[in-house]
Structures are given as structure tokens and as C-alpha cells.
UniProtKB/Swiss-Prot annotation:
Gene3D superfamilies: Endonuclease/exonuclease/phosphatase (3.60.10.10). GO terms for molecular function: metal ion binding; poly(A)-specific ribonuclease activity; RNA binding. One of its GO terms (cellular component) is cytoplasm. Acts as a catalytic component of the CCR4-NOT core complex, which in the nucleus seems to be a general transcription factor, and in the cytoplasm the major mRNA deadenylase involved in mRNA turnover. This is Carbon catabolite repressor protein 4 homolog 6. Belongs to the CCR4/nocturin family. Component of the CCR4-NOT complex, at least composed of CRR4 and CAF1 proteins. It holds the Pfam family Exo_endo_phos. It comes from Arabidopsis thaliana. It is found in: Nucleus; Cytoplasm. The gene is CCR4-6. Its main location: nucleus. It catalyses: Exonucleolytic cleavage of poly(A) to 5'-AMP.
Length: 754
């Protein structure tokens, strides 16, 4: 009993000692720092603790120990002790899911990542063995190899093509001399706001009202003007001058403005960069003071301030430095009326003579002439400017501007039949018959100078009363469009009129329909005044039977086309004291209506009086005017004839049939070779003005000696403009396009310090 107790005690002690000996290092390795040396609860006197910290024995034992691995170690030690085996620590198999302990000398190779993880985890110069890399994409960059961009995964993007209306600079073949001072000049008819509204039904009805509003168009115009970045800008049809001046003031421009005389509220304006030029002289021409209608022109002298040593953002010096240049800038909007070549010539002649005088006053400063000239390239008026001389002998007065070759574009009936259907209905709600529409169209044309040649392609003829009243931008082009279905094309021109009991429009209502608005357009007032001046009262009351086809016919003579219509209507009128026949109608056109007649008609229109009797108009005619009409009843109209007064208007001398000027002028666009689809055979733009009833060229920039053309802004191709029925568009803010030229001062014109 005692022996067994002793053996048990010895075995227990040995076991405890062995267990303590074996578990001591395990205890030491496994115990966390706060519990090192503590005795844990458990069987026997040996303390036990638990830890999941990995440990690497410094003595070389690399046993991987977990929190409960010492149970197996004690069991194995007791088993080997019982069988007399020497002590050897057992190394349990390594758990492949466990991470190895940190060792700076340990080379750890993780398993190869999945195929989709190559680019994210793969390290430089470390490739797992026995792997196939053919299917794996290469890494984007290696430290030991040259970098190359990754291959494009998508198709190669093509270069963005330029829009069809993109405008590029076109350069002259001869560049200016090095060091020449250059400046950019612009000419632009920006379309007056009130004209756009007044002519919306005839010229711009395809354009939404909001896009035709001044706010919308102003933003487009200001953006475009800023884009071209001209140093000098000559603008026509400017009625919102204060708005435009404020916008351009923030962009460094100063400006002057001259409003037209008469009832119009638009005019011409000249802008210039304040840090490039300063204004040294200014004057304007009011042509009405010379008996040349209500158009105006501007003349100013600008002196350069920006030298090669001055930056554009610097304030210019108050006084000009030695070697500065001066330039005379002229801006004009010529009368529209295509048959009044005498007034057109008179206006241009007056401006050129005045510009030459101003140039002489300022030491022969070179001249730049900009504007809307309402004449076609190579017309007699164009040739007068370029060739310095024009002979009126044998030249028809209505052929001076070349507008007989203008292209008018009558609106298609389907575009507005529904829109204007209510305007063409009678009071009983029935649509007016064709003959009434024809009569209405003729009454719309009651102010037309019946001496106008039937082949004139003015916008007045096909586009009804609104254009008949005159849109001065409508003038010239190269082609002639057919005048078919003109009766339906002109329906919208009679929308505010009602037939009388006889089915015809009354004379009183017809006259009231010709009332000039309080804010009369420049086009409208110019053309109306032209037309009022060019016809007598009797002719105004006798041509309402003319048909649109006769107006548009390019092959019929004007007298024969109207003669069959005059007698019937004259009989209906029964005007006492007036003896009218065909020649009478055409005779009073030119000389019967003087300034007194214009004053009378202006008052009549302004008062808006409804005349109830057809004879009231005659009773109000001044005696002098009436007698002139009666005395001329036997004169037959000839479009080639010139009265002494008309010759004096054109040439300045009633005894002289030639008109001359002293300036050597060149059109800047004709000096620069351009694309075939943007230029005509003369080098001028194919189109500078485009709306519903016209497409052609009327705008120019001219330069005198002392200046050299460097480059011009290419016009918009005609095909690119024809995608829309007419301008303005959501992109372009006017029915004209801007002409821009860069000019250089010639060294011979360098001025000494004054």
C-alpha cells in the first residue's frame, strides 16, 4: 500500500516536473505580457495560460504554437516518458491556412492570385514559377523597362470636322513689310430691333419670336463681335445704341452714333478700341439737308496709340507719339430704292468728296470706307466707287445699283397659308377670291413707282406690303427666281384690310394701310419716301388693278403691262378735273412729287385719317403739285431718261452727265483670293445679306492708298446658309454677315509728330 502510494507520488512528481519542464517554455512563449508568471487555474500545481500570439523561438525551435497546443505536448511527453523514449519536442503540422510569423529573413511567397488580380497584386520582377502568362495582360509599368501607354481599348476617335459655316482668315499673297502697324476693321449691318419686329410677318416669320428678340440677338451679336476682335467696327441699323455701347464698353470700346433723320430711330455707329485709337475728328452727313433723303453717314479720324512697346492692357498715353498713324473712317447706309439711282449716286458722291476733304485736312490720312451700299458687285454704282468715274449717258436710272439682277425669294405659300388664313378672309368668313387678292396686292403696291422696270428683283415686289414699305437690306444678288403664284404669295400683305361693298379695297382703307409707324424702319421710311416721291396722286389712285404677275415679269415692258389695267380703274374713280390716261400714270413718277408732296403724305400718314370719299386725297393736293401733275400728263416714262434735277442730284451739276471722285479705292475682299464657293468672279462675297425675300451682296469694305490689305475673314458659303430659309438663326444674330479685314499702314503714310 505504501509502495503503491510512493510509486504514485513519484510518478506524479515526475509527471509534474516533466510537464512543468516542457510546458515552461510553452507557458513563457504563449503568455501575454500582462500575465507572464501568473498561475492559471487548472489541474495540478503547474500554472497554465492561453495565448493566440504566434512566436518564433530564438533557440531555433520553430514550433508553431497555438493557444491550446500544450495539451497535446503534455500528452506526448508523458507517453514517451512511459516508454523510455528520450525527450524530443513534437512539431505539429503547419496549418496552411495560417500566416507564417513575421521574420525579416523569411522569404514569403504568396500563392498566385487569380487571373483577374494580376495587374492589381503582381509585384515587379516576382513571377510565380510554372505559370502561363500568355493569357494575362502585361502590367502597365515596370521599373526596369521603358514605359509605353496601354493599348487603346476603343476605336480611334476621328478629328472633329468644322461646321459648314466656319469662317477662316484668308491671307493676301503679298504680306506687309516687317514692322508695319496693323489694325482690324469690321463692317456689319446688325438688323435694327424694331425692323425685325415690323417685318416679322414677311421676312422672319420662320424664326421664333424669342430668337428674334433683341435680348437673344444682342447676346449673339456681342459674342460674334468679341470673336472677331476688331479694332474698328462700323455698324449699320443700330437702334439700341445704348445697350450695345454698354456691352462694348466693358470690352474696351468707345463709340459714336448718328441716328437717321425722319421717323426712323436707327442709324450708323462706329466703335474703336480705346487702347488702340483715339478720336481726333468727328463729323456726320445728314443727306436730307442736301435733298438726298433721310439717310446718314459718319466720318471720323482715329489716331493710333498702341505702339510696339505698349501692351494692350496698358493705359495709352494721352498724347500721340512720334510716328503715329491716322486713318479716316467712313460709315454709310445707302438708300435702298433700286430705281432711284440718282439719290444713290448723290449719297455716295457726297460721302467720297467729304472723305477726301477730311483726308487732306489731316495730312492725307488713308481712308477706310465701310457700309451697306445697296448695290451689287460690278454694278454702275460699284464701278463708280472703284473706277472713280461714271457716265450717265445711256444708263437707265433704275440700273445704277444693279438691283435689277437681284435674287428675290418669295415665301412659299405652304409656309404661311395656315398662319395667315384668317387675314385673308372676308367679313363673312369666306376666303377672298383670287381677283380680290390681286387687287389687294396692287393696292399694297400703290406707292410703287410704276416706272420701275418689271425685271427689278427687289424684295418689295414679291413680298407684299411689309416689304413693299421697304426693307432696305433687301437688294441684290446674282440669280432670278420665278414669280409664279404671286397672288398667293402676297396674301399676307393684306391682313389688316377689309373689302368694301363692291368687293374691292376702298381707297381710304388702302391709304390708311400705308401709314408709316411712329418708329418707322430705316428700310421702310427710305423706301416709302422714295415711293411716295416717285408717284403722283393720280398714279396712286390708278394702278391698283396691276397684277403681281405683271410686276414680276422680266420680259414685259412696264407700260404695256399696266396699260390694260389703268383705264378700268380710272373710270371707276371718276376724278373730276383730272384727265388720266396711260402716259399720265408714268409721267408724274419722277418730277410731280416734290418736297411739298412728301410733306403732305407724311402728315397724312402720321394723322392716320380714314378718308371716306375717294376724292378727298385730290382735294388736299397743293396747287403747285397738282398743276405739275396735269402739265406732265403727256410725258411718257423712260427708265433711261434723266431730268436736269436728277442729273444734278447724281452729279452735283445739272449740265454734267458724268460723275467723278478723287479717291483710289480698292475693295479689300477683291484683293484676297478666296474659296470658289464663297466668292463670285469679281472676288466679292457671294452672299452678305440673306432673308426670306433676298439673297445677295450689298456690303463692302473699301480702302484707299496708304493702306494694304493683309487678310480678310472668309464669307459663309452660300450652301451653308441655305439650310435655313433666311437669317437670323440661333447662331447668327442678323440677316447680314459681318465683313472683317485686317489692314496695314504703309510706311509712306507714317505721320510726323504734330
Amino acid at each position: 500500500m505504501r509502495r503503491s502510494r510512493f510509486v504514485a507520488q513519484v510518478f506524479s512528481d515526475v509527471t509534474f516536473a516533466d510537464a512543468s519542464t516542457i510546458s515552461a517554455p510553452i507557458f513563457t512563449m504563449s503568455t501575454r505580457a500582462p500575465y507572464r508568471g501568473a498561475r492559471g487555474r487548472g489541474r495540478g500545481r503547474g500554472g497554465r495560460s492561453f495565448s493566440d500570439r504566434p512566436y518564433n523561438d530564438d533557440a531555433g525551435r520553430d514550433q508553431f504554437v497555438t493557444g491550446d497546443s500544450h495539451f497535446q505536448s503534455v500528452h506526448d511527453a508523458n507517453f514517451r516518458f512511459r516508454h523510455g523514449e528520450p525527450y524530443r519536442q513534437h512539431q505539429p503540422p503547419l496549418d496552411q491556412r495560417q500566416q507564417p510569423p513575421f521574420n525579416q529573413n523569411y522569404e514569403f511567397r504568396p500563392p498566385p492570385p487569380s487571373r483577374g488580380q494580376w495587374q492589381q497584386f503582381r509585384q515587379p520582377n516576382q513571377f510565380p514559377s510554372n505559370q502561363n502568362y500568355a493569357a494575362c495582360p502585361p502590367p502597365p509599368f515596370y521599373q526596369n523597362q521603358m514605359s509605353r501607354p496601354p493599348p487603346q481599348q476603343s476605336f480611334r476617335q476621328r478629328p472633329r470636322s468644322k461646321p459648314s459655316d466656319y469662317r477662316e482668315w484668308e491671307y493676301a499673297k503679298t504680306p506687309p513689310s516687317p514692322g508695319s502697324e496693323k489694325f482690324v476693321v469690321l463692317s456689319y449691318n446688325i438688323l435694327a430691333d424694331y425692323l425685325a419686329n415690323d417685318h416679322w410677318r414677311s421676312l422672319y416669320f420662320h424664326i421664333p419670336r424669342n430668337m428674334l428678340s433683341w435680348g437673344w440677338r444682342k447676346s449673339k451679336l456681342v459674342f460674334e463681335l468679341s470673336l472677331w476682335s476688331a479694332d474698328i467696327m462700323c455698324l449699320q441699323e443700330v437702334d439700341k445704341f445704348q445697350d450695345l455701347e454698354e456691352e462694348m464698353k466693358h470690352r474696351g470700346y468707345s463709340a459714336i452714333w448718328k441716328m437717321r433723320t425722319g421717323n426712323a430711330v436707327d442709324g450708323c455707329a462706329i466703335f474703336w478700341r480705346s487702347n488702340r485709337f483715339k478720336l481726333v475728328h468727328e463729323e456726320s452727313i445728314q443727306f436730307n439737308q442736301l435733298g438726298l433723303r433721310d439717310n446718314v453717314a459718319q466720318i471720323c479720324v482715329l489716331e493710333t496709340l498702341l505702339t510696339s512697346h505698349t501692351k494692350e492692357n496698358e493705359t495709352p498715353p494721352p498724347e500721340s507719339s512720334a510716328g503715329s498713324h491716322r486713318v479716316v473712317i467712313c460709315n454709310i447706309h445707302v438708300l435702298f430704292n433700286p430705281k432711284r439711282g440718282d439719290f444713290k449716286l448723290g449719297q455716295v458722291r457726297t460721302l467720297l468728296d467729304k472723305a477726301h476733304a477730311v483726308s487732306k485736312l489731316w495730312d492725307d490720312a488713308p481712308i477706310v470706307l465701310c457700309g451697306d451700299f445697296n448695290c451689287t458687285p460690278k454694278s454702275p454704282l460699284y464701278n463708280f466707287i472703284s473706277d472713280r468715274k461714271l457716265d450717265l449717258s445711256g444708263l437707265a436710272r433704275d440700273k445704277v445699283s444693279g438691283q435689277v439682277s437681284a435674287e428675290f425669294r418669295p415665301p412659299r405659300p405652304e409656309n404661311y397659308t395656315t398662319r395667315y388664313q384668317s387675314a385673308n378672309k372676308s367679313p363673312q368668313g369666306q376666303v377672298q377670291p383670287p381677283n380680290l387678292i390681286t387687287n389687294a396686292h396692287m393696292e399694297n403696291n400703290s406707292n410703287i413707282d410704276v416706272g420701275t422696270a418689271p425685271s427689278e428683283k427687289t424684295s418689295e415686289l414679291p413680298c407684299g406690303d411689309t416689304i413693299l414699305a421697304g426693307h432696305e437690306a433687301t437688294s441684290s444678288s446674282d440669280q432670278v427666281l420665278p414669280c409664279e403664284n404671286m397672288a398667293s404669295d402676297c396674301q399676307f400683305g393684306i391682313e389688316n384690310r377689309k373689302p368694301d361693298d363692291s368687293g374691292n379695297l376702298s381707297t381710304a382703307e388702302d391709304l390708311s394701310s400705308l401709314t408709316i409707324s411712329d418708329t418707322e424702319p430705316q428700310h421702310a421710311s427710305s423706301a416709302r419716301e422714295d415711293l411716295n416721291t416717285d408717284r403722283s396722286v393720280s398714279s396712286g389712285l390708278s394702278e391698283t388693278e396691276q397684277t403681281p404677275e405683271e410686276i414680276c415679269s422680266s420680259d414685259q415692258d412696264i407700260s404695256s403691262s399696266l396699260s390694260t389695267k389703268v383705264d378700268t380703274f380710272v373710270a371707276e374713280m371718276k376724278l373730276d378735273g383730272l384727265k388720266l390716261d396711260e402716259p399720265v400714270v408714268f409721267a408724274q413718277d419722277e418730277e410731280s412729287l416734290g418736297e411739298d408732296g412728301e410733306t403732305f403724305l407724311a402728315k397724312l400718314h402720321d394723322n392716320n385719317e380714314n378718308l371716306s370719299q375717294k376724292g378727298e386725297l385730290v382735294s388736299e393736293v397743293p396747287l403747285k403739285w397738282s398743276s405739275e401733275a396735269l402739265n406732265s400728263d403727256k410725258i411718257t416714262y423712260s427708265p433711261s431718261s434723266w431730268t436736269p434735277m436728277e442729273i444734278a442730284t447724281a452729279t452735283g451739276d445739272p449740265e454734267r452727265t458724268t460723275v467723278e471722285h478723287a479717291l483710289e479705292l480698292k475693295s479689300t475682299y477683291s484683293e484676297v483670293e478666296g474659296q470658289a464657293n464663297t466668292r463670285d468672279e469679281n472676288g466679292e462675297p457671294v452672299v452678305t445679306s440673306y432673308h426670306r425675300c433676298f439673297m445677295g451682296t450689298v456690303d463692302y469694305i473699301w480702302r484707299s492708298e496708304g493702306l494694304q490689305t493683309v487678310r480678310v475673314l472668309a464669307p459663309i458659303p452660300k450652301q451653308a446658309m441655305q439650310w435655313t430659309p433666311g437669317f437670323p438663326t440661333p447662331k447668327w444674330g442678323s440677316d447680314h454677315i459681318a465683313l472683317v479685314s485686317e489692314l496695314a499702314f504703309c510706311s509712306s503714310k507714317t505721320l510726323p509728330k504734330s
